[in-house]
Amino acid sequence: MIKLTARQQQVFDLIRRAIERSGFPPTRAEIAAELGFSSPNAAEEHLRALARKGVIELAAGASRGIRLLGIDDAPHQLTLPHAALMQLSLPLVGRVAAGSPILAQEHISQHYACDPALFSSKPDYLLKVRGLSMRDAGILDGDLLAVQKRTEAKDGQIIVARLGDDVTVKRLKRRPGGVELIAENPDYENIFVKAGSAEFALEGIAVGLIRPGEF
């Protein structure tokens, strides 16, 4: 049995809770802020110690490149253990006009070259998040959400959906007679959508997250 110091156990438990809550491991800055470290460098030291003990794996160059190891009931996380040799070129989608496809050319502001190790599976585009409705899932205003195009999603997955003229990011929960779009922030209301509603269309699922300034 691997023995961790009290501080290392705190860091490990924080990583696990973050992955259970959102699917994303925390950044060094988030670990430092949560546990009261003086800087992200202090968090990095503890992460390296955990990696040496074989309980996590770190992906070089990825701010969220942390993977839990050797745990039978480890939560599913939206990251990969190793960087691939090739880079992905992903379009960044800004504001989406009503009634037009998300990937319409006029919505694409630029392209990013991304390390595939940042994502659980290959995304099709990055969507700039607006608002704080998913704050408690670690998704903040201005973040770039990596999205894989899908027309179906599993219960509990974080999705991108078109709702009337708007595009929204929420957690999907299936309910009798429809689905509920769950906000991860008590300041925002959940949205119930009746089965077969013409106002609702699933656009994709979240497969990763990039925070500007950490990219």
From Swiss-Prot:
Q: GO annotations under biological process? A: DNA repair; DNA replication; negative regulation of DNA-templated transcription; proteolysis; SOS response
Keyword flag Repressor: yes
Residue(s) at site: Cleavage: A98, G99
Name the enzyme group at the top EC level.
hydrolase
What EC numbers are recorded for this enzyme? 3.4.21.88
* DNA-binding region extent: 28-48
- InterPro entries, alphabetized: LexA, LexA-like, LexA/Signal_pep-like_sf, LexA_DNA-bd_dom, LexA_repressor, Peptidase_S24_LexA, Peptidase_S24_S26A/B/C, WH-like_DNA-bd_sf
Question: Any idea which residues are catalytic in this one?
Answer: S133 (for autocatalytic cleavage activity), K170 (for autocatalytic cleavage activity)
User: Which Pfam family would be a valid example here?
Assistant: LexA_DNA_bind
Residues annotated as coiled-coil are none
| Subunit text | Homodimer.
Task: Describe the family membership recorded for this protein in Swiss-Prot or TrEMBL.
Answer: Belongs to the peptidase S24 family.
User: Which PANTHER family does the record match to this protein?
Assistant: LEXA REPRESSOR, LEXA REPRESSOR-RELATED
Q: What does this protein do?
A: Represses a number of genes involved in the response to DNA damage (SOS response), including recA and lexA. In the presence of single-stranded DNA, RecA interacts with LexA causing an autocatalytic cleavage which disrupts the DNA-binding part of LexA, leading to derepression of the SOS regulon and eventually DNA repair.
Q: What protein is this chain from?
A: LexA repressor
- Protein's gene: lexA
